[in-house]
Regions:
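Secretory targeting and sorting signals
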Residues: 1-25
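Beta-strand-enriched cores of mature, soluble protein domains
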Residues: 26-183
């Protein structure tokens, strides 16, 4: 499962709508703050993913719960802005998220152990260069993928607008619709 390619990942939290904190738990529910605190800058720091919940109709037609069952993601801060907020971060490490349909109990263990280089912009937008599987949540009308939860795998870039719009651009890869898997 370990990938050591491009630049690394802790992606699930950010892709589901959260911006991770460096050297501190990503206060992880979707929609939490967008400020990233800089860590020591002397190596790789843990970047844990928190559980998440989406009501029916927000990602899938049914309510969904996600929880890490394997989380060995680390991050390395490359650059900070003059105010100390993080500008560019590498993420990598093993991450498996159990995604559960809370109406039926059906679940799927999604491998999100990809790697990424993420640039956080001052307007709240982000730019991703990624390799390997990452869990991506898309709201209605908020991306170039339909509303849903996906494992995006391969080589790709992703832009996340300040408004949360996610544009996934596959160079080579696949998308796996998790709502269909557990629906």
């Amino acid at each position: 499962m370990r990938r050591t390619v491009l630049a690394p990942l802790a992606l699930a939290a950010v892709l589901l709508g959260v911006r991770p904190a460096v050297a501190a738990p990503a206060s992880a529910g979707p929609g939490n703050g967008t400020h990233v605190e800089a860590g020591t800058g002397t190596g790789w720091d843990p970047a844990p993913s928190a559980p998440f919940d989406f009501g029916a109709g927000l990602r899938c037609d049914f309510p969904v719960h996600g929880e890490p069952v394997v989380d060995r993601v680390v991050q390395h801060v490359l650059d900070t802005d003059p105010d100390g907020s993080v500008k560019r971060v590498l993420y990598k490490g093993d991450l498996v998220i159990r995604v559960t349909n809370t109406e039926t109990g059906a679940f799927y263990d999604a491998d999100a152990s990809g790697s990424a280089l993420v640039e956080y912009r001052t307007d709240g937008s982000q730019s991703w260069a990624a390799h390997g599987p990452v869990l991506v949540g898309v709201g209605e009308g908020k991306g170039n993928l339909p509303r849903g939860l996906y494992v995006v795998d391969g080589v790709y870039t992703m832009s996340i607008g300040a408004d949360g719009y996610k544009a996934v651009n596959l160079v080579r890869g696949t998308t796996d619709d998790l709502c269909a898997r557990i629906g």
